């Protein structure tokens, strides 16, 4: 509980082993310093996934180079998915460190087909795009139900960055759920959720009570 990792927008990955009193850089030998997400496997704290490319898409946002993985708590890294763009969230299965999801926002300044939610079931050797809307819509968040990891929630965000501004929102944005581990997805509407169009979407599942889900929607 005294070990922490921190992702920096342009400063790589840092680690503390004394509860945050001191920090050391552990990613400086890698080809990118723009970090969007860190996920530590609950079943094996030596397994750490890093999604590069921060998803706060300001005018001078730095693109990432895909996904990196460590199996020795950050001492060494493998470049397991090579794509440019932004990754905002990663999450690891609570009992299987080989299963992980990535919310890929993609390139901030234009349409690109790699946007969406990706899943690996073999420890990062291969990644499958399991949720995709269109080339203008990326994934802004992904969350697992810790008590039932077959239940996965994801937020999609239709967004386009220009040097002078940001276009956020449109028919592509929405909140989705999968009840079979990411194989199939259903968009959630109504029942208290605001009418569209939406912008950026965030989602979280309460750890102690998986049926309680929190969603934050720009609407």
What does each of the following model-derived ranges do?
Residues 1-219:
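Beta-propeller blade termini and top-face loops
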């Amino acid at each position: 509980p005294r070990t922490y990792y921190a992702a920096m927008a342009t400063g790589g990955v840092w680690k503390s082993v004394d509860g945050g009193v001191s920090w050391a850089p552990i990613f400086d030998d890698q080809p990118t310093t723009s970090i969007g997400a860190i996920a530590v496997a609950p079943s094996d704290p030596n397994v750490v996934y890093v999604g590069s490319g921060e998803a706060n898409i300001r005018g001078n946002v730095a693109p990432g180079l895909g996904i990196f993985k460590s199996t020795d708590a950050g001492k060494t890294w493998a470049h397991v998915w090579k794509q440019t763009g932004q990754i905002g969230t990663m999450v690891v299965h609570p009992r299987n460190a080989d299963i992980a999801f990535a919310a890929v926002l993609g390139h901030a300044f234009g349409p690109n087909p790699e946007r969406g939610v990706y899943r690996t079931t073999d420890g990062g050797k291969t990644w499958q795009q399991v949720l995709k809307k269109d080339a203008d819509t990326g994934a802004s968040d992904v969350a697992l139900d810790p008590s039932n990891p077959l239940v996965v929630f994801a937020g999609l965000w239709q967004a386009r960055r220009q040097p002078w501004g940001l276009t956020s929102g449109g028919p592509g944005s929405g909140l989705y759920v999968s009840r079979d581990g990411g194989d199939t997805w259903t968009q959630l509407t109504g029942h208290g959720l605001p009418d569209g169009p939406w912008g950026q979407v965030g989602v979280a599942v309460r750890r102690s009570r998986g049926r309680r889900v929190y969603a934050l929607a720009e609407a």
